[in-house]
Amino acid sequence: VPEASTAHEVTPVRTTPESRVFSPAAVVASCGGFVLIGALQALYGPSIPAFRDDFALSPSAAGLGLSAHFVGGVAGVLVFDRLYGRLGNRLLLGSSYLLMALGAAGFALAPTWPVALVAALLAGLGFGGIDYGLNQLFAVGFGHRSTAMLNILNAHFGVGAILGPALVAAVGAEHYPALFLAFAAANLPLLLCLRGVRDQVPQPVPGTTGTAAGGSPLSRSLGSVLAVFVALYVLHVGIEAGVGGWEPTHLEAVGYGAGAAATATSGYWLMMTAGRFLAAPLALRHSPRTIITVSCAGMTVCLLLASVPALAPYAYAGVGLFIAPIFPTGLPWLNAAAPRARRAGALVIAASMIGGVAAGPALGKAIEWSGVRAVPLLLDAVSALCLLATLWLIRATRPPSPLPSLSPLPSPSPVRSPAP
């Protein structure tokens, strides 16, 4: 029995004014929430020199702040998913915003580094709840427009990720407590907009149930689909983090100055943000599988071109453009391909966070063996795996062709007796 028999497309929910999940004000507030979580994640890195001065830390100890944030993020995804459907969406999102605010304020006011790490963990817990909660609700809350809305939502994360370091540069890393306190205060107005979020969301009605002939799902096949989705998310987020972390080093190694390398890396992040805004109208015309296939193919070509020094800065910008839609576009595809796997979204989002954390050390080990100049080729090999995973998922989630109906045999013509 082919594995495609247990993971099929479903008919998306058509939203009506009575069934919509978000009011217009809540949509705007949700995008604002994603600006905040993007900024929060991006505040830690540029503030590390100030952490070291204030708490007399080694570089590795100072880096634990971001690690605590990511650990809290993974825990927040898993906790939110466990409570999703049991508690109302407003309560869960409101609790997540409050945890982020309390954690950020605690980090700003912490008297010792261990207290600061606990606060970063708390802020990360709220970060994970917002990240998973809004992604999950946007994936099911806009019917056929969900993919487009997810791209817009995640584009605002990129806006925050660009805004955070810019604020640190503007006010100085030594003033990081003021930035974290301002971030904490910015969470509070968003609580007022939660009245526009529906507490319970409509569930998609499968067009095909994905069950075997006897009515029970073939769990091995569904497990394979989920495993490949997880692999796709871990690998592409690893590429995203790998380019962001190692592009400046690679460009300097092939002859670019530090300023030019930093500018090119900023261009990569800008293109990734722009790519998600650009993908929104495309998502209304093309299926998620088509968008992700083109994205993986384009990303693979651009990483190959990045190995040519003269083309590298422009090729990395192309990587940002093509990688942009994969994360938000994959979630509706996952929900459609595995409608019975309720925790599938939490699994891939948590896995993507782990992939982002693991990408730096893993790529660093590979670079020790192959050299910095091999960075684009190493990432290109990972991108090729993303493309293969996408092609496998297209085959595995394709609805089976209906059996051809047998035409009834024509009835025999009556035998006419010869005329007398």
Q: Language-model features: where?
A:
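Helix-to-loop junctions at the C-terminal end of transmembrane segments
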Residues: G76-N89, G172, G275-P288, I367-E368
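Helix-loop-helix hairpin linking two adjacent transmembrane segments in secondary transporters
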Residues: H144-R145, I152-D199
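C-terminal transmembrane helical hairpin of 12-TM major facilitator-type secondary transporters
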Residues: H286-G330
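Cytoplasmic helix-loop-helix junction between adjacent transmembrane helices
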Residues: A119-A155
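Helix-breaking motifs and short loop linkers at transmembrane-helix boundaries and internal kinks
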Residues: A56, G88, L109-P114, G143, ...
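Conserved MFS/SLC helix-loop-helix module at the cytosolic interface between two early adjacent transmembrane helices
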Residues: A75-P114
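Intracellular juxtamembrane helix-capping segments at the cytosolic ends
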Residues: G129-F142, A324-P339
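Extracytoplasmic gate region of multi-pass secondary transporters
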Residues: Y44-G45, L222-A274
